[in-house]
């Protein structure tokens, strides 16, 4: 029997051949040979799987899922079949450089982190931090995520910050290192979330169990972003507003009605802003998200 490898990099793909062609070469170049490389295909209807088997069968293992399970459940199902001591969940639109695996693993060992991510910068403008994690994720009291180097949509230049190793509240799902023991302890992602906020939810649950999460400042990866859902997608807005509420209600300690009143007010203002811009689909996405959450309240 083959021994369990120390690390496995797992890329979840859905109709992303264009991203695989662009970004997979950097993963192949900068990932050590003793690290397993997997692409878990989420029921793609393009020729991603055929292309991988034709061009990279000797290095990349392909796991085909029968349908698009979304980011959260897709990874849950994929990792049931992949053995490793540490998983690296890597978006298909991420470009890696240097000793990105080994350096991050060393930081995890040094600080005792169960979950970590490197600094995430923009692929098209690598001087600037990227929305999905930047230099470490945090959450404010009203359930709005922010990052070191990123507030809402405003991202700082990486050179303007002290990019040291630091403990954070959540790690970027674009390049997400997690110990297998922690993954199993938390039972993976919440598949009901489908996509968005799943890494925040998992990190929060693990922190409630006593685990620590960090950002490794010694490595930067470059993320394109919007690879599956564009920023102005009503479905993306629905998932973001719905999942933010669900994650807060599930993990936050305290009196939930008071929190819900605040979020109803703040999200209502966001919906009115969409309405003032003529973005009717985005406006309805906020209302639909709240309706889906209210149906789950006790």
Where are these regions (language model features)?
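Glycine-rich, basic loop-to-helix element that forms the pyrophosphate-binding segment
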Residues: 64-82, 92
């Amino acid at each position: 029997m083959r021994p369990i490898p120390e690390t496995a990099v797992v890329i979840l793909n859905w109709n992303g051949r264009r991203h695989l062609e662009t970004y997979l070469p950097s993963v192949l170049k900068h990932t050590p040979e003793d690290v397993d490389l997997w692409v878990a295909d989420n029921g793609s209807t393009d020729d991603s799987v055929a292309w991988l088997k034709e061009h990279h069968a000797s290095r990349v293992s392909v796991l085909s899922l029968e349908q698009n399970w979304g980011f959260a459940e897709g990874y849950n199902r994929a990792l049931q079949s992949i053995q490793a001591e540490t998983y690296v969940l890597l978006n298909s639109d991420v470009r890696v450089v240097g000793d990105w695996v080994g350096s991050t693993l060393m930081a995890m060992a040094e600080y005792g982190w169960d979950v970590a991510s490197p600094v995430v910068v923009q692929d098209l403008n690598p001087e600037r931090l990227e929305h999905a994690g930047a230099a470490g994720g945090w959450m404010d009291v009203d359930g709005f995520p922010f990052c070191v180097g990123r507030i809402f949509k405003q991202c700082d230049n990486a050179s303007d910050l002290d990019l040291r190793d630091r403990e954070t509240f959540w790690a970027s799902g674009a390049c997400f290192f997690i110990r297998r023991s922690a993954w199993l302890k938390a039972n993976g992602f919440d598949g009901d979330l489908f996509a968005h906020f799943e890494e925040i939810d998992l990190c929060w649950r693990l922190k409630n169990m006593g685990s620590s999460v960090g950002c490794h400042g010694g490595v930067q990866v470059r993320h394109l972003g919007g690879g599956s859902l564009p920023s102005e997608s009503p479905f993306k807005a629905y998932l973001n507003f719905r999942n933010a509420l669900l994650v807060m209600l599930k993990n936050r300690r305290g009196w939930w009605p008071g929190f819900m009143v605040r979020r109803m007010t703040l999200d209502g203002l966001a919906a009115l802003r969409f309405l003032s811009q003529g973005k009717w689909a985005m406006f309805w996405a906020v209302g639909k998200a709240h309706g889906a959450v209210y149906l789950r309240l006790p």
